[in-house]
Amino acid sequence: MSSATTTDVRKGLYGVIADYTAVSKVMPETNSLTYRGYAVEDLVENCSFEEVFYLLWHGELPTAQQLAEFNERGRSYRSLDAGLISLIHSLPKEAHPMDVMRTAVSYMGTKDSEYFTTDSEHIRKVGHTLLAQLPMVLAMDIRRRKGLDIIAPDSSKSVAENLLSMVFGTGPESPASNPADVRDFEKSLILYAEHSFNASTFTARVITSTKSDVYSAITGAIGALKGPLHGGANEFVMHTMLAIDDPNKAAAWINNALDNKNVVMGFGHRVYKRGDSRVPSMEKSFRELAARHDGEKWVAMYENMRDAMDARTGIKPNLDFPAGPAYHLLGFPVDFFTPLFVIARVAGWTAHIVEQYENNSLIRPLSEYNGEEQREVAPIEKR
């Protein structure tokens, strides 16, 4: 039996400080979040997603020349291996899109002859590849399920605009043709890009700590992000709102869920207790999208659910609550909300993988045994 006492056991590692990181800082006491020292709301209003990606990797915002070189390198990887295209088309259309994303990353690893290289430059090369190709995987998966032709990437466009173009085309009704829609979508990517030692990032760091490869770390992170208690929550939020349908029924739905002790997705956070610092920025984008796309119904439902939850529990929304209806207004299928999260979070995951490799210590916690005491094996005929 271990020497730990019951009070030493922290289920879910709640409150445990597992390591140092310079990538981001979550400050629940002031309801704030910084990436490399910059307030996330400042980055959302003043930077592109690519600038934030660069910042998370290098610790500083890029100069104009550095950003141009970063974009040129990333966009040079916007082509998919023929085998990967064939693999995606061979997968069941009923498969969860997160499983398609995970499978795509695993396949990419099999094609990289230097996959086990752990130096930071190789990790960043893989990050560039994922940044370029995962939006293509997502767009291809959406369109193949609908029986639509695949749209090729455009190397002149940003990550956000290119993704919207590949999913929805470039017609006048496409969000890719509306700069305001592109910008609000880009802001969501910035908000989802990084959040310290969350479950998926910690999973990536655990895998990295064993000196495994970056593709294994990313596939493990995708698996963790798929869960409804982590990234999958934004899908559950929208499924709930679609099921409620009528804003006037939202408060009753919340009260009924609480009466039956059901978990209400989109509310509460393991770290933030006074509200998620990313919500104001995401809510602003959600309201702007609603104003442009006849989404007043979803704003009313959002407000009614939020107010009912606050009145009963005092629990505040997290980022997934406004992000869900925002992605719905853009036109994304609900099951693809979490894969969008993947595309954004690749920035944070790869920054943490580099950080873990550069100052590595195997992550191997202890456990407190609470099973049977030592016993002797009885012959099978006497059991």
From Swiss-Prot:
Coiled-coil spans in chain: none
Binding site for substrate: 73, 195, 278, 345, 364
Record GO cellular component, one term: cytosol
CDD domains the UniProt entry points to: DsCS_like (cd06111)
Matches recorded under InterPro entries: 2-MeCitrate/Citrate_synth_II, Citrate_synth-like_lrg_a-sub, Citrate_synth-like_sm_a-sub, Citrate_synthase, Citrate_synthase_AS, Citrate_synthase_bac-typ, Citrate_synthase_sf
Cited SUPFAM superfamilies: Citrate synthase
PROSITE patterns for this protein: CITRATE_SYNTHASE
Transmembrane regions: none
Swiss-Prot/TrEMBL GO biological process terms: carbohydrate metabolic process; propionate metabolic process, methylcitrate cycle; tricarboxylic acid cycle
Induction: By propionate.
EC class: transferase
Pathway: Organic acid metabolism; propanoate degradation; Carbohydrate metabolism; tricarboxylic acid cycle; isocitrate from oxaloacetate: step 1/2
Binding of CoA, residues: 263-267
Record carries keyword Transferase: yes
Enzyme Commission number(s) of this protein: 2.3.3.5, 2.3.3.16
Catalytic activity as recorded in UniProt: propanoyl-CoA + oxaloacetate + H2O = (2S,3S)-2-methylcitrate + CoA + H(+); oxaloacetate + acetyl-CoA + H2O = citrate + CoA + H(+)
Subunit and partners: Homodimer.
Misc note: The prpD2B2C2 operon is essential for growth on propionate as sole carbon source.
Its job: Involved in the catabolism of short chain fatty acids (SCFA) via the tricarboxylic acid (TCA)(acetyl degradation route) and via the 2-methylcitrate cycle I (propionate degradation route). Catalyzes the Claisen condensation of propionyl-CoA and oxaloacetate (OAA) to yield 2-methylcitrate (2-MC) and CoA. Also catalyzes the condensation of oxaloacetate with acetyl-CoA but with a lower specificity.
Protein name: 2-methylcitrate synthase 2
Species this chain originates from: Corynebacterium glutamicum (strain ATCC 13032 / DSM 20300 / JCM 1318 / BCRC 11384 / CCUG 27702 / LMG 3730 / NBRC 12168 / NCIMB 10025 / NRRL B-2784 / 534)
